[in-house]
Regions:
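Hydrophobic packing residues in well-ordered alpha-helices of helical domains and bundles
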Residues: 11-15, 73-80, 113-116, 120, ...
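Actinobacteria-biased recognition of intrinsically disordered, low-complexity terminal regions
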Residues: 1-16, 24-27, 230-234
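Short, mixed-charge aromatic SLiMs
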Residues: 71-82, 140-156, 220-232
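Hydrophobic protein-protein interaction segments
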Residues: 138-185, 192-193
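C-terminal interaction segments
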Residues: 189-234
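Hydrophobic/aromatic-rich structural module bridging two neighboring secondary-structure elements via a short loop
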Residues: 59-113
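Short, contiguous alpha-helical
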Residues: 20, 30-66, 104-160, 200
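Soluble acyl-CoA-dependent acyltransferase catalytic core bearing the H(X)4D motif
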Residues: 2-14, 52, 57, 70, ...
Length: 234
C-alpha cells in the first residue's frame, strides 16, 4: 500500500543516492564502533547486514533464490558496493511494474524501490550517528518512512501474529511535513506524538524514545509506551 505522497517520490533514484552516501561513509567510521540501538552490533555487522538485505531483496524482486554470500570475512566497501549495485541494476532492469515477491505477497517490483529506500535510510542514520556524523535528508522522505511503518510494517506484524492489535490508535503528527497518521487503526487516538518526520520515523524504528528532545507527547503516555513496546517493525 502506498499513499499519493509516497507515489510522488522517485524511490529508486533516492535509493541510489542514499546507497552512495552509505558507501562513502563506510571508510569514515571505525568498523568496531558500537551501534547501540542495534543490540550487540558493531559497524561491520551493520554494513554486512545491509549488503545482505540488498542481495536478498534483488532476489525477491526478480522472484529467484539468491546465492548465499557466505560468512566472510568481507572487505566492507567492496561487499556493499557490489550488493548495492546488484539491487539497483536488478530493479532498473525489471521496471516498476514487473511481478515480484514482496513482504505482503505478490506485488509490483516497485515495492522494493520503497522498502529498500527506507531500509537504507534508517541504516544510514545508524552508521552516521554511530560515527558522530550528521545526516541531512528531506523531511518528505522521512515522512514516507513513517508512512511505511503505519501502512505496511505495523499491519504486517499484526497479520503475522508478531504483535497484538493496539487497544487504541496512536496519532503521529509531523510538524515539518504537514502530515498526520493513525498508527494501529482508525478511531479516537489514545495519545498524540508531535515531532519532526525524522524523529517520528526513528521512534517507529526503535531509535528514539518519547522522552527525547523534539518529541511532544499529549495524552495517555502508558498507551504510547505499550504501543512502542510491541513489535511494530521486523
Amino acid at each position: 500500500m502506498t499513499t499519493d505522497v509516497a507515489a510522488s517520490l522517485d524511490h529508486l533514484r533516492l535509493l541510489g543516492a542514499l546507497q552512495d552516501d552509505f558507501l562513502t561513509t563506510i571508510p569514515q567510521v571505525d568498523p568496531t564502533t558500537r551501534v547501540p540501538w542495534c543490540g550487540r552490533w558493531r559497524v561491520r555487522d551493520l554494513v554486512v547486514h545491509l549488503a545482505r538485505i540488498h542481495h536478498w531483496a534483488a532476489g525477491q524482486a526478480s522472484r529467484r533464490r539468491e546465492t548465499p554470500l557466505g560468512r566472510g570475512p568481507f572487505d566492507l566497501v567492496d561487499l556493499y558496493a557490489t550488493c548495492a549495485a546488484e539491487l539497483r541494476a536488478t530493479l532498473t532492469a525489471l521496471g516498476p511494474d514487473a511481478p515480484a515477491s514482496t513482504l505482503v505477497g505478490p506485488g509490483p517490483a516497485s515495492f522494493w524501490h520503497r522498502r529498500q529506500l527506507h531500509e537504507t535510510l534508517v541504516h544510514l542514520w545508524d552508521l552516521r550517528t554511530a560515527g558522530g556524523l550528521p545526516l541531512d535528508v528531506d523531511a518528505g522522505v522521512w515522512a514516507d518512512t513513517v508512512d511505511e511503518v503505519v501502512t505496511v510494517m505495523q499491519p504486517r506484524q499484526e497479520a503475522l501474529g508478531r504483535m497484538e492489535p493496539l487497544p487504541a490508535p496512536v496519532a503521529l503528527v509531523a510538524t515539518d511535513a504537514g502530515r498526520t497518521w493513525l498508527l494501529g487503526g482508525d478511531g479516537e487516538p489514545a495519545v498524540t506524538v508531535t515531532a519532526g518526520a525524522q524523529d517520528l520515523a526513528l521512534l517507529g524504528w526503535g531509535r528514539r524514545s518519547p522522552d527525547d528532545d523534539g518529541l511532544l507527547v499529549d495524552g495517555d503516555r502508558a498507551a504510547l509506551d505499550d504501543a512502542l513496546g510491541r513489535r511494530l517493525t521486523p
